[in-house]
Each structure stands twice: as C-alpha cells, then as structure tokens.
C-alpha cells in the first residue's frame, strides 16, 4: 500500500489549497461591504458586535453642551428631556428627513485610521437629536463634513471628547445602531392650537423611532391617524380640546403600546404627560 501515499498527499495538498483560496476570496468580498474591527471595551456599554460602519465625527455646543439645545428633532431642553450631553446632529445621509430622531448609536474612534487622535478602548452611545446641514460652499473633505452622501456625526462636545482628542477637531469613527435605554415611560408634550394638535413624543426606548401614531378623544371610540410633522412631532387636525386623550404608538420594530387616557380632559397646550409604559 506504500505506493499510494504520494497520491494521497497530493490530493490533500490540493484540497487544503482550494479551501484556503476560497476562504481568502470570501474574506475579500466581506471586506468590500463592511468594516470589521475588534469591539472597543467600555465600562458602561455592552460589548458590541464585530461589524461596524465608517463615518467621521466633529463636535459642537461647548464644554457643557448648552449649544445643542433645541434642534431639528424638536426636543427642546435636552437636559430636562433626559437626553443630556450624549447627543448628536446627523448628516443628511443619516438624518432621513427627521425619521431618525431618537435613534441611538454606539460610536468609537477608528484607531486604524487615526490612532494619534483616538482614546483607545472607549465607546460612547448617543441619541440623534438634531440635523447637521450641508455646507455647499466647502468641499466634503474640507469643511463640508455633513454634505451628502457622507455619514457624519456632529456630536455634543462632552460626548465627542469621550472618544477623541480635542486638538483633532474631526476624527474618523466606526458606529452601529443600538437599542436606546431610557428611564421611565414614554412622554407626550402637546403644542399647537384647537384644530392643530402637535404632539412631541420623547423618551422612547429600544429603537427610539416611531413608525406610526394614532390619537383618540374621549368623545369617540375611533382611532384617528396622526402624521409626522417634523422631527419627533406628530400632528392631528381634529378638534380634541377638552377631551381625555389616548395615544396608540407603534415603533419601528412593530411593537404597539396603547396609552389609555394618558392626557386628562383639562389639559393645556404646552403641557407634558409622562406615562408608565415603555417599549421593551
């Protein structure tokens, strides 16, 4: 049987070579569509999956993030609304005309591209609260950081400095969408006037995003569909003044919560009503 050994060894070598070539080809294809990196460690965040997307990040709002208040999502005072200093304005590519308001992202400085400007082993989780508009007077790679199609985060300065060195000004980052963790229940703030009820929805956990919303007054048993007006604001053109209000809210995962009579009949425009219900 000894003469058969050279053939067996040759067959084994060819087989191993084919497997290695196939694995290398698969690896090259994967690299073309995703960025693979070791998940940075963090004392406050859970370990992230190994697949991240590339972007860049700058900062604004000052050392106390006071300049980030307000914004295109309509959250107003980010401190009182529970968003604090862990927030960011998104470029056009990420903002999605306001539909991304409330979404949470885990971000790390990309040490492979700029090790000298990164704080190693740290991630920060932010909530999308604002829009970073394009600057068509400047090129996308020199000042027009938020110009389409660039994915870009203009982060609150305290959040940015968790992952980057201040002198850099702009850093390459890797990011991924993550579930939002919130304290307490979903909150509703009613603005507008008698025939234009504008409802701001805040403190939304899990996806952070609202897919659809309905309202029902106590004078009816019918749910009335609401329309997203801007940012995290939804409106109804029905006359609901003086009625108890219920809201039916569906998030982007398809989970629906009914907030029955969350608003009492004596409500006033400008008031906020906190529920005990939260998406899970």
Swiss-Prot record:
SMART domains named among the record's database cross-references: DPBB_1 (SM00837)
GO process annotations (BP): plant-type cell wall loosening
SUPFAM superfamilies linked: Barwin-like endoglucanases (SSF50685), PHL pollen allergen (SSF49590)
Topology within the bilayer: Peripheral membrane protein
Gene Ontology, cellular component aspect: extracellular region; membrane
Record key words, sorted: Cell wall, Cell wall biogenesis/degradation, Glycoprotein, Membrane, Secreted, Signal
Compartment(s) of residence: Secreted, Cell wall; Membrane
Broad class of where this protein is predominantly found: secreted
Region forming the signal peptide: 1-24
Gene3D superfamilies: Expansin, cellulose-binding-like domain, RlpA-like domain
Protein name (record): Expansin-A22
Source organism of this protein record: Oryza sativa subsp. japonica
Top-level taxonomy: Eukaryota, Viridiplantae, Streptophyta, Embryophyta, Tracheophyta
Gene name of the record: EXPA22
